[in-house]
Each structure stands twice: as structure tokens, then as C-alpha cells.
Amino acid sequence: MNHFPKLLSSQIGFDVAQTMLEYFDRHYRIFREAAVDAKTLFERGDWHGLQRLARERITSYDERVKECVEVLEDEYDAENIDDEVWQQIKLHYIGLLTSHRQPECAETFFNSVCCKILHRSYFSNDFIFVRPAISTEYLENDEPAAKPTYRAYYPGTDGLAVTLERIVTNFQLDPPFEDLTRDIGCVMQAIDDEFGHFDEAPNFQIHVLSSLFFRNKSAYIVGRIINADRVLPFAVPIRHVRPGVLALDTVLLRRDLLQIIFSFSHSYFLVDMGVPSAYVDFLCTIMPGKPKAEIYTSVGLQKQGKNLFYRDLLHHLSHSSDRFIIAPGIKGLVMLVFTLPSFPYVFKIIKDHFPPPKETTRAQIMEKYQLVKRHDRLGRMADTLEYSSVALPLARLDHALVRELEKEVPSLLEYEDDKLVIKHLYIERRMTPLNLYLQNGSDADVEHGVKEYGNAVKELMKANIFPGDMLYKNFGVTRHGRVVFYDYDEIEYLTDCNVRRVPPPRNEEDELSGEPWYTVGPHDIFPETYGPFLLGDPRVRSVFMKHHADFFDPALWQASKDKLMQGELPDFYPYDAALRFSVRYPARFGATGENDGAGDAQRAA
């Protein structure tokens, strides 16, 4: 520190620090209670309750921050506390965290509160946690009644089948399994199919995280197999095959499959973690290369993920020299998008003004982004990180980008010494725009992209999402080849839309008209009219009609809306339906097995 306090003499400093930690502890207690409730809701098959719980948990953090800020302002006149006391507040807070089990998350909470009270000129390590102060290495909950982060199992003692069954039954799920012996046999067959015969080394063991990961209609067992110097990841989704009866749906044994279920395009898991850093460290061992920021976000600690991401950005800026540039591709009417080529993300800013035909406001667009944050993204909508007062070094901004910023978003800019402060922006994973992917791709790429696009829109439809603007430029292709939607300014709930057929033309003049001859309400959608915008390229048209000819039939859209209006929640799988045991090993299921994965079995990733 520049002016390190020699004595922690301020009682107010201690009281403020203690109050802030009390509100963080309240937040984390609610966070853990949500994961415990998720287990109960999963056991009951209360899918609507699980959706509601996930939505409520997302807003809980900001509610606790708001409550804490109000208390500090009312009881301690926080805005007028002097600099030396603020430094003491941070030091007292560090002292209170020395034996805390979520210190990194508590530091982030401290930052969130301070950023509501202090001017951004105080956003330095003197006053907030620009860098972490408390180490999380080897952190564990050592209370006698506490669950360990993970449990170790040794198949060499009792055999693999017995060990796998013990792993499943140790989670003590209330509903019975349809046939756990059958399912364990499927797991062993899948392991054999993937790895073949292998010799068991003396250290052969299985590590399993002690809490289940809940999302959608699944509960995931997550762990790793260790044999000699190999570390093999796995995840086993548990699902209801019918009300009150469970089954192991598959086992995912490849790192890329785990990276997909933990990806930025899926909703956050509900998982009970006494020591979140220990869970994240474990997940890093089975998904090396995946940023910790993304892992924290995927397990529901999105504010911690956001904090780590910003630290990653600052670190990258200090170790790179390229410039931020306008993102390649077709410019949007609503958002200004730029990127740093050496950093795999895009930065999106809502423009000050929108040209016709756009009729919207900044507040409406921000609400659309919140809608996506709260909604089940199913692996088909990109998550966004929302930031305020982001300071970027002017020397790293391309001149063309600066001119574009000054033209399109002058109200959001503030020059501060050698930095440009952007008052509000969103950050997303960078993807290849689907229109460029189709334009530049091989025939095989076009087939893959078009098939994925149709699947993505149909899955969003079943999840009650109408994308609005469905042009290819509003979708991206991830590094795993998945098509993901990322332009949200026209997004609507499908249940709020009026699906219509185009009325027949009344005469030849109507037929030749370039304008609709029928009235169009603000929520009317006409699937029959999408063809001219999507099928202009002959290669695309051929593949589209091969895989998704029903896309332009209003009956498809209306059927999804009707099911949603009846309260039906379709099944979605963040892995190929062909991996499901009932599909992969049908002989093991016989007449009692599930169907072949058609119908509601949708691939959501």
C-alpha cells in the first residue's frame, strides 16, 4: 500500500468489515440452501420448481449487496468515511478471512459493495481486492461433520462394479433406480468401449466430488479416474425415466464432452460446495485449459467468475501489445462490437441511437440480456458478463475503433488520463459468425452449420425462446462446432408470440407486392416468410430443406407454443442422444427401456 496504516485503530473500520462479511455469509448460506433444495426438487421431479429456484438464485447476490450497502450508508455514513479508515476496513476484512472457507468469494463481495459506494478512482488494490489477499491452496472444511470435497474409491479391493454401485448409492437419492445393476453394466461397457482393456496400476482409484450437480432434469455425478499417470474425467447424468424412478442416462468419458456441459452457453449448475475453490481446483484437473473464471461461473458463482475474468483481462493486457479493433463481420444496428484479436472474447456496447426499423430503448435491450441470464440457455445462448466503468488504455485502441466509439456511444465514454472509460458493456466468448462460417466453409461445413442452426432454433423454440432476428449473422459457431445464438435485442418468449400463416393474396397486385397485404401485429410471427432470408445460397437451401423442411411450417412453431402453454417442459440433453445408454445398448433395456432417443430427446449442445 502507498500509505499502509501502522495501527488498526478504527472501531468503525472493524465494524464495517464485520458487517460486510456478515452479509456475504448470509449470501453464501442462501446459495448453499438453494443447492440443497435442488436435490429435493430433483427427487420429486418438480422441474418448474427447479427452474424457479435457479432464477431466484441468480438475483440473490445483488440483493445481498444492495442490503449491505444500505446498512453501511444508514449506520456508518459509508460515503463519507475517509481514505485511511477505508484502508483499515480492507485490512480488518483480510484478518476476518484468515480461517474463512470461501475467502475468494468474500473478497469479490467486498469489491461489489465498495464499487457501489466509492468512486472508481478508488478502484485500486489500496481499497479493493484487485488481487486476491487470501490463498485458497489446500483449503478444506476440517469440521468433523463436514463432507470432504471429494471421496476416493479403490476398485482393486471390491471390484469395479461394486465400487461404481457404491459411488451412486452414496448420494442417497430418495427415488429408487429402475435397474441400477443394468446401468452399472452400461457404465462398465462404455468404459471398455472407450479405453479397451487396461492394466490396473497400484494407484488405481476413482475420485468423486461429494455433491451432485443439478441442472434442467439431470443430476450429474462428476469425478476422475486415476490409473498410473493418467487422469481420466467422467460425468454420469442421472435422470427420471418416469415419475419417481431413476436411471443412469450415460457416462461421459471425454474431456471435450465435459467442457461442453460446463460451457458458457449452458445455465449454471446448482451444487452444494462448502469450499468452492476446492471444487474448482478439482474441475481444473479434469478440464485443464478451461479458465477458472468459466468454471466458477458454471457452478453458479458468476460474480466470482466475472471478477476472475477481469483479472485475466488485465493480466493479458500487461502481456500483449495488439490493439482492440472493430469486430469483423456485418455491423449491427443496435450494438457496437469490438475485440482484441489475441483475446478470445468480444466486447458489446449498446449504441446511443438506433436507426429504423429498430424501435427499442437501452433499458429494453438490457432487460433482454437479463432475460437470457435468467432463462435456461440449453447450450444454445451465449452467457454474457456485464461490466460498468471499464477503463481501457487508449494506446491499445485502434484509431478506427475510437472514431466509431465517439460516433456511436459518446454518452458512455469518459476520458481519464491515458485511459478510455466505458460506462457500460457486455463481454461474450468470441465465436465464428455463422454467416461467415457458411460463406467460407466446405460443403461438409455448410451441412453441419445448417443442421446445427435448425437444431438450435428448434431447441430454443421448445424452451420458450423466439430469437426474433434469425439471420445467420446473429448466430455463432463455437470451437466445439455448436451453433449458439448471441444477438438478444429482439428476443421474445414464444408464448408471447402470435404464430400466423400468411393469408392468401387477394389479387394479382397483392401477389406481386413487395409489402405485406395483411395486417401485422407487434407480436405476430410468420414462419413461412423466413425462407427468402435464409435460403438465398443454393448450397444452404439444399441442405436446409434436407434437414429442416418443417422449419417454415407454422404448425411446428404452434405445436411448441401449445405444449409450453400446457406447462410441458421437454427433455434436453447436453450431449448427443446417441450416447444415451437406452440408445447405445438397447439390448440391455429390452421392452422396459426408453425409446430410441427420438421425439423429445433433443441435443442441446
Curated annotation (Swiss-Prot):
Catalytic site: 383
Keyword Transferase part of the UniProt annotation: yes
EC number: 2.7.11.5, 3.1.3.-
Binding residues annotated for ATP, in chain numbering: 327-333, 348
Reactions mediated catalytically: L-seryl-[isocitrate dehydrogenase] + ATP = O-phospho-L-seryl-[isocitrate dehydrogenase] + ADP + H(+)
InterPro entries hit by this protein: AceK_kinase (IPR046855), AceK_regulatory (IPR046854), Isocitrate_DH_AceK (IPR010452)
Coiled-coil ranges per UniProt: none
Keyword list, A-Z: ATP-binding, Cytoplasm, Glyoxylate bypass, Hydrolase, Kinase, Nucleotide-binding, Protein phosphatase, Serine/threonine-protein kinase, Transferase, Tricarboxylic acid cycle
GO cellular-component term (any): cytoplasm
Compartment annotation: Cytoplasm
GO terms classed as biological process: glucose metabolic process; glyoxylate cycle; tricarboxylic acid cycle
Molecular functions (GO terms): [isocitrate dehydrogenase (NADP+)] kinase activity; AMP binding; ATP binding; phosphoprotein phosphatase activity; protein serine/threonine kinase activity
Family: Belongs to the AceK family.
Function description: Bifunctional enzyme which can phosphorylate or dephosphorylate isocitrate dehydrogenase (IDH) on a specific serine residue. This is a regulatory mechanism which enables bacteria to bypass the Krebs cycle via the glyoxylate shunt in response to the source of carbon. When bacteria are grown on glucose, IDH is fully active and unphosphorylated, but when grown on acetate or ethanol, the activity of IDH declines drastically concomitant with its phosphorylation.
NCBIfam families: PRK02946.1
Protein name (database record): Isocitrate dehydrogenase kinase/phosphatase
Record lineage: Bacteria, Pseudomonadati, Pseudomonadota, Betaproteobacteria, Burkholderiales
Protein encoded by which gene: aceK
